[in-house]
Amino acid sequence: MTVAGGTAPAAPTTKPGKAKAEDIKAVGEWYTAFVDYERERRATMPQGLSEKDTPFDILLLSICSLSNDDLVASQLDTHPVLNRFNIRFDEFNSATGYSGPALLRLLNGACGQPSHNDLYGERRTECELMTRLGTLGYTQRLLMDHSGEYDNFLQSLRDKAGVTASIDKAKFPLRYMGFDDEELADDLAVLRHWQRTSMHSKDRRTVTLMNFIALHDGNRLPGHGRSEPFKPRAKRLLDDLDTFMNELERSGRKVMLVVVPEHGAAVRGDKIQAPRLRDIPNLRITQVPTMVKFFGIKNLPDEQIHVSGHTSYLALSSLIGKTLEADYFGKDGGSVPLEDLVKDLPQTNPVSENGQAQVLKYKDREYVRLNGGEWKPYGG
């Protein structure tokens, strides 16, 4: 079943053709209007929760290097685990091609989409998903298959996104050697550690950020000099996720699992950008398989709900807010029909940015701006 999302400021549409000078000017004006509009948007969340509301955990699983296009290019787009989710966003834009800004965008997703520069500006706590959930009684948790030290990754989440939890540390089995020679933990072991420790936790409600970089380009098997190809690593991760979901279902624990990749791996590239390069965040890289699964609720419909239209992190934060507002876990089959839960989620026009490149869609065509220069049609 497909359910349309809500509204976003309309982007002009015409048949593709040679870009006109007036279009180039209009693209810049449209981008400025987009940023101004997004700055005022907010996700709606409850002011508080009743003692009668059914507690549940929220698990945000952030996966590096996995786009919709990567799944197709690797013949993994029909992997069985993808159909097990209750909700799938068909055109979710991660809005960047790099890990650091992707996590900042996810964790600041209770507001509209900021520019790349604004993302690193002054903190706005009203935009921080973990902070907003903290006011509702949610305790933070943090797990990774890496240390978070590379490129000051973890510290930026603390400084710019309201992450206060310490990393859960355990002696996990070694799975890969990272591109930077860091030891990377086995992802299934990390998932099982979360489940095991959650079962013994005294916290009534937790929100966990879990970040995996197993699919990052350059990772290799221990003792091997060459990088492990993308497809076997991706299949292994999807298989592990399938196993984890089986075990979580058997536990009966009430959990909202949100899978939201950071960006793609650029498995096959395009005419402009070679495979595995992500300097220009085009739609092949930034449209990622974002999915939601509810555990611990009996009699949910088997049919997967597809959210159509262009969406991004504001829709995800809004969905979490609607789940809380509806006390969705409080009734068998969910307190409201699943299609009502995703109805009218806010849409966001596809605009993506890195520090040196911006990409957007205008008149059914992708445009790119490099290093603050002139907007040009993207010929990929």
Residue ranges and their predicted role:
Residues S115-Y120, G178-D181, G225-A234, M245-N246, ...:
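Active-site rim elements
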Residues M1-T54, E126-C127, T131, T135-L136, ...:
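Membrane-interface soluble catalytic domains
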